């Protein structure tokens, strides 16, 4: 992990197109401004983890839903042939 020290209004450059600037420091909170292309997703860590958990849960639900749908289609197909 790279550790950098920045003062108020100083910035960090990541690659050619991402810049992180220290906008304010109030007690134990630091306000950051991030300039990045629109295609770059930026989230607070706790939000990112919640999104990952939700996506993981949705993928499992989708697999079980597809399995049930497949069983229903087999049942319908079997019913039409009879």
UniProtKB/Swiss-Prot annotation:
SUPFAM superfamilies: CsrA-like (SSF117130). InterPro entries: CsrA, CsrA_sf. Gene3D superfamilies: Translational regulator CsrA. GO terms for molecular function: mRNA 5'-UTR binding. One of its GO terms (cellular component) is cytosol. Its main location: cytoplasm. One of its GO terms (biological process) is bacterial-type flagellum organization. The keyword RNA-binding applies. Belongs to the CsrA/RsmA family. Homodimer; the beta-strands of each monomer intercalate to form a hydrophobic core while the alpha-helices form wings that extend away from the core. Each of the alpha-helical wings interacts with an FliW monomer, yielding a FliW-CsrA(2)-FliW complex. A translational regulator that binds mRNA to regulate translation initiation and/or mRNA stability. Usually binds in the 5'-UTR at or near the Shine-Dalgarno sequence preventing ribosome-binding, thus repressing translation. Its main target seems to be the major flagellin gene, while its function is anatagonized by FliW. This is Translational regulator CsrA.
């Amino acid at each position: 992990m790279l550790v950098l020290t920045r003062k108020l209004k100083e910035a960090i450059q990541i690659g050619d197109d991402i810049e992180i600037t220290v906008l304010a420091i109030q007690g134990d909170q630091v306000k950051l401004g991030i300039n990045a292309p629109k295609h770059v997703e930026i989230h607070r860590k706790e939000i990112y983890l919640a999104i990952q958990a939700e996506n993981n849960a949705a993928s499992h639900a989708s697999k079980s839903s597809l399995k049930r749908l497949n069983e229903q289609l087999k049942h319908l197909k079997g019913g039409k042939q009879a």
